């Protein structure tokens, strides 16, 4: 007899109810809880999954390259990137009538296609690809890379090739390897690609497999490098009149510090980007030699942490500092994952911001729908990564934290004064919430009653001052870079002339620091409310994960438990998992405000109508009417009794997203008993219905647990929310700008 699922838990495999299936899925990735799991086996399994992850990323890139080459219009787009719409892939759908076929036969295609809003065309073009053949070659290369990664993952699970636990616990060697080899070398290698391939292509000089060994990336060759005369590589940069992809206006510089944007592409200068990656690479290679391994040179992280404690007799006694942290972190995968997720979350949000404020890909700044899609995509990813960071921080406290090993150090002291931390976050959230909502509601009421001049409009003077210090001239603050005769401004003009043009939007619409006013002030504080409330829930979940005054023994119940039975009142909804669950709702709420703000402000700029945002964003009805309702109008006319247009698929997705979202509430509002009764009734009916009763099942059907129903509800709420806004965002932007 075959082993029943899940093979990793014999206890679950013998469960006679459908609980076996759902708990099996829920715990499939909780390797720590699996039968016969040792610490060494755990590390080896995780190590192998990294290669699987890399393979999936490689296949994703390969698939995109392949479909763009096969079904896209890359070569036509390269010839005229501002007027040709890039094609993602062909659509074949048996449901399409002639009207839909005509509507989706777009962008010069001969059959229905989807338009690409991923920015991949801009990326491929910027890094030096210009033909379909190159896309196919790239696709095959990524496929081979994925196969290699899958093989590596399999290999490292074989007995002879499994790394030992000691190898995984060698933090210094791993850090050096990641810093110097993975970050450092790959950054320098990328500089090499930019200098040898992308920059020549941008100047009309093709570099391919056929000629890359005999095309000099710089006329002076390596001479200046070996003689220390590096400035030669920055001389003779591209001119302001350079035509991207041609020799017209091109220079010979390969590593520059021009600042600002290429006037035609409105993207950062490729030679600036190459310089940036070279500098980053060199710094990381140096950083990768900092930590002491078996060579006996460099710093010991353990010694650094042990030394980081306050001098004895310090007023207020600051405790044992960082003592004990080395082993605490090195022995806890959840702690390490929490740190990694938090770092990646911040970086992803930064990517969202930088991709529009300082675009690095040629012409992407003019593809407004792509800009909106990429910003929204990266901010959504950032909130999930941040929520995950706190979730694993809480699991660390429950499963891995050792009070003895961390006596009186910074971790222990965080737990000891958690009430102060949580209550301060609570106070900040309440303050932001009441004041921001108060201002919005006041403004809404006075506008409704016909006296808009009575609105309370606060100029964000401090933020404007910061913008002025960075060179924004519009506000008239005579400070730092905005002080035209000052030392800072003169130095900036000498060293990075393009910066002031970029910051003040001199050329084109690419404005680094957008002008801000009372509408921005209000929505900034609404977003701050969302961020602080999300943080409050997440921080409270982690700090209370081991126990609280209400439930001192909470850690004994694990990460996710519904309640401690009926006899102990008030223990529902207080597991660390519940905090994560509640925080995701707030995180989604917040990212909604962030993306609404970004999108509306940019729609107003792109349409040349900034007054609409400035005047309507100071009261609630302005947001509902002039952002949400006004921008839904084209979308919901994607199909009607008179036919359909190329927004029809987004209009349908908009409705479908609402449906998925609303389904979530069915799981969130009705609890387990309701479903159990319903299931028992359905089973009764099934067994008494001819033909149907010929089909039975081995597992007794039972309702989902409370925690499972919540996660199913949360998943529907989240996915529906994302589908709805994605359809709205893409349709409302592409409907206006083509």
UniProtKB/Swiss-Prot annotation:
Cofactor binding, note field = PSI electron transfer chain: 5 chlorophyll a, 1 chlorophyll a', 2 phylloquinones and 3 4Fe-4S clusters. PSI core antenna: 90 chlorophyll a, 22 carotenoids, 3 phospholipids and 1 galactolipid. P700 is a chlorophyll a/chlorophyll a' dimer, A0 is one or more chlorophyll a, A1 is one or both phylloquinones and FX is a shared 4Fe-4S iron-sulfur center.
**Keyword Signal attributed:** no
What does the record say about its membrane topology? Multi-pass membrane protein
Which annotated residues bind chlorophyll a B1? 658
Describe the reaction catalysed, as an equation: reduced [plastocyanin] + hnu + oxidized [2Fe-2S]-[ferredoxin] = oxidized [plastocyanin] + reduced [2Fe-2S]-[ferredoxin]
For binding [4Fe-4S] cluster, which residues are annotated in this chain's numbering? 563, 572
What subcellular compartments does it reside in?
Cellular thylakoid membrane
Membrane-crossing ranges are: 46-69, 135-158, 175-199, 273-291, 333-356, 372-398, 420-442, 521-539, 579-600, 647-669, 711-731
Residues annotated for phylloquinone binding in this entry:
675
> One GO cellular component from the entry?
plasma membrane-derived thylakoid membrane
* InterPro entries per the UniProt record, alphabetical: PSI_PsaA/B, PSI_PsaA/B_CS, PSI_PsaA/B_sf, PSI_PsaB
Q: What class of enzyme is it?
A: oxidoreductase
Keyword Metal-binding assigned? yes
Give the residues the record marks as binding chlorophyll a B3: 666, 674
Q: Name one GO molecular function term.
A: oxidoreductase activity
Please explain the role this protein plays, according to its UniProt record.
Answer: PsaA and PsaB bind P700, the primary electron donor of photosystem I (PSI), as well as the electron acceptors A0, A1 and FX. PSI is a plastocyanin/cytochrome c6-ferredoxin oxidoreductase, converting photonic excitation into a charge separation, which transfers an electron from the donor P700 chlorophyll pair to the spectroscopically characterized acceptors A0, A1, FX, FA and FB in turn. Oxidized P700 is reduced on the lumenal side of the thylakoid membrane by plastocyanin or cytochrome c6.
Quaternary data: The PsaA/B heterodimer binds the P700 chlorophyll special pair and subsequent electron acceptors. PSI consists of a core antenna complex that captures photons, and an electron transfer chain that converts photonic excitation into a charge separation. The cyanobacterial PSI reaction center is composed of one copy each of PsaA,B,C,D,E,F,I,J,K,L,M and X, and forms trimeric complexes.
Q: Which family, according to the similarity comment? A: Belongs to the PsaA/PsaB family.
PANTHER family (UniProt xref): OUTER MEMBRANE PROTEIN, OMPA-RELATED, PHOTOSYSTEM I P700 CHLOROPHYLL A APOPROTEIN A1-RELATED
The protein depicted here goes by the name Photosystem I P700 chlorophyll a apoprotein A2
Biological source species: Synechococcus sp. (strain WH7803)
Q: What is the lineage of its organism?
A: Bacteria, Bacillati, Cyanobacteriota, Cyanophyceae, Synechococcales
């Amino acid at each position: 007899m075959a082993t029943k699922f899940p093979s990793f838990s014999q206890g679950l495999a013998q469960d006679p109810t459908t609980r076996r299936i759902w708990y099996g899925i829920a715990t499939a990735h909780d390797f720590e809880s699996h039968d016969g799991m040792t610490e060494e086996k755990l590390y080896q399994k995780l190590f192998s999954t990294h290669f699987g992850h890399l393979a999936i990323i490689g296949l994703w890139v390969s698939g995109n390259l392949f479909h763009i080459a096969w079904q896209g219009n890359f070569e036509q787009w390269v010839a005229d990137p501002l007027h040709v719409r890039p094609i993602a892939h062909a659509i074949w759908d048996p449901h399409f009538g002639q009207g839909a076929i005509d509507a989706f036969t777009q962008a010069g295609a001969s059959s229905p296609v989807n338009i690409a809003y991923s920015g991949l065309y801009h990326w491929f073009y910027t890094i030096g690809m210009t033909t379909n053949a190159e896309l196919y070659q790239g696709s095959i290369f990524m496929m081979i890379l994925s196969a290699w990664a899958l093989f590596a993952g399999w290999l490292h699970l074989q007995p002879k090739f499994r790394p030992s636990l000691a190898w995984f616990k060698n933090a210094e060697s791993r850090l050096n390897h990641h810093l110097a080899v993975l970050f450092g070398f790959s950054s320098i290698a990328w500089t090499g690609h930019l200098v040898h391939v992308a920059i020549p292509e941008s100047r009309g000089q093709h570099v391919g497999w056929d000629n890359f060994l005999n095309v000099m990336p710089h006329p002076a060759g390596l001479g200046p490098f070996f003689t220390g005369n590096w400035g030669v590589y920055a001389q003779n940069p591209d001119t302001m009149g350079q035509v991207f992809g041609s020799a017209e206006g091109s220079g010979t510089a390969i590593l520059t510090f021009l600042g600002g944007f290429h006037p035609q592409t409105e993207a950062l200068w490729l030679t600036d980007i190459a310089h940036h990656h070279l500098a980053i690479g060199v710094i990381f290679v140096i950083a990768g030699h900092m930590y002491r391994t078996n060579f006996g040179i460099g710093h010991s992280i353990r010694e650094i942490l042990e030394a980081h404690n306050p001098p004895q007799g310090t007023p207020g006694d600051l405790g044992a500092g960082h003592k004990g942290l080395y082993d605490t972190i090195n022995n806890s995968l959840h702690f390490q994952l929490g740190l990694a997720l938090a770092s990646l979350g911040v970086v992803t949000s930064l990517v969202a911001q930088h991709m529009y404020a300082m675009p690095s890909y040629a012409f992407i700044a003019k593809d407004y729908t792509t800009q909106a899609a990429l910003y929204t995509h990266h901010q959504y990813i950032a909130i999930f990564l941040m929520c995950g960071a706190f979730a694993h921080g809480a699991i660390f406290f429950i499963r891995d934290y050792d009070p003895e090993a961390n006596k009186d150090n910074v971790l222990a002291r965080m737990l000891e004064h958690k009430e102060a931390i949580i209550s301060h976050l609570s106070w900040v959230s309440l303050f932001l919430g009441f004041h921001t909502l108060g201002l919005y509601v006041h403004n809404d009421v006075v506008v409704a009653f016909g006296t808009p001049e009575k609105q309370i409009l606060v100029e964000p003077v401090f933020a404007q001052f910061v913008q002025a210090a960075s060179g924004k001239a519009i506000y008239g603050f005579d400070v730092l870079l905005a002080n035209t005769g000052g030392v800072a401004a003169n130095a900036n003009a000498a060293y990075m002339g393009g910066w002031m043009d970029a910051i003040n939007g001199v050329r084109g619409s690419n404005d680094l620091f957008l002008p801000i006013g009372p509408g921005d002030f209000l929505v900034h504080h609404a977003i701050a409310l969302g961020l602080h409330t999300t943080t409050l829930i997440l921080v409270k979940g982690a700090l209370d994960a081991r126990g609280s005054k209400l439930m001192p023994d909470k850690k004994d119940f694990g990460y996710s438990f519904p309640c401690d039975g009926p006899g102990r009142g008030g223990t529902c909804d207080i597991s660390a998992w519940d905090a994560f669950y509640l925080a995701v709702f707030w995180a989604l709420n917040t990212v909604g405000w962030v993306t609404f703000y970004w999108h509306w402000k940019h729609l107003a700029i792109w349409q040349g109508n900034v007054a609409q945002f400035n005047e309507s964003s100071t009261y609630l009805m302005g947001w509902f009417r002039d952002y949400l309702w006004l921008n839904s109008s084209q979308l919901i006319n994607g199909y009607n009794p008179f036919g359909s247009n190329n927004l029809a698929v987004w209009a349908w997705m908009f409705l479908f997203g609402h449906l998925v979202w609303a389904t979530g509430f069915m799981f969130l509002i009705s609890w387990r008993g309701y479903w159990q009764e319903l299931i028992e009734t359905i089973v009764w009916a099934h067994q008494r219905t001819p033909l149907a009763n010929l089909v039975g099942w081995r597992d007794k059907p039972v309702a989902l647990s409370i925690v499972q129903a919540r996660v199913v509800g949360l998943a529907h709420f989240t996915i529906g929310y994302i589908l709805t806004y994605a359809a709205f965002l893409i349709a409302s932007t592409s409907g206006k700008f083509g």
